[in-house]
Regions:
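Acidic, Ser/Thr- and Gly-enriched intrinsically disordered low-complexity segments
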Residues: 1-147
Length: 147
């Protein structure tokens, strides 16, 4: 307890630090994408992209249907050409917690002949699976922003 620590070590806990720092937090990230198809073929490709994320965030049933497995996780990266982007933040492994779709982002209902929408807006919400610690920055050069 606090009194014991004060007597044995001469140290006092700073109550302001406790108020400020309640523990490590998991970071959340949100990304919005406008996906516009110029043809029905591109529209089908967009549908596959949307399904990839919606299905990837869904829990997986075990073969016996008695248990659920965790959904897929995602490794996010910003790229500058083919290289990692040093001026933007890095991410730890993330879970996709939300996938919101807007089917009429411009306020107009427009489809191709097969019914596929001409434009979608997808907003993805990710949360890192572990907090960022001071020591995590050791893996980056001084010229990188890190996490």
């Amino acid at each position: 307890n606090k009194a014991l620590m004060q007597r044995t070590s001469g140290q006092v806990i700073n109550p302001n630090m406790e108020l400020l720092f309640g523990g490590p937090q998991l970071r959340d990230f949100s990304f919005a994408f406008n996906l516009t198809a110029r043809s029905a073929g591109e529209g089908r490709t967009i549908l596959r992209i949307l399904r990839f994320f919606k299905q990837g965030m869904s829990p997986i049933k075990s073969e016996s249907n008695l248990f659920l497995k965790s959904p897929h996780t995602f490794k996010l990266e910003y790229k500058n050409g083919s290289r990692d982007h040093k001026a933007l933040n890095k991410f730890k492994e993330c879970a996709l917690k939300s996938c919101a779709l807007q089917y009429t982002p411009d306020g107009n209902y427009a489809t191709f002949e097969d019914g596929i929408m001409t434009k979608y807006q997808m907003t993805l919400g990710f949360t890192e699976l572990e907090p960022v610690f001071n020591s995590d920055y050791a893996e980056f050069s001084k010229d990188e922003i890190g996490y």
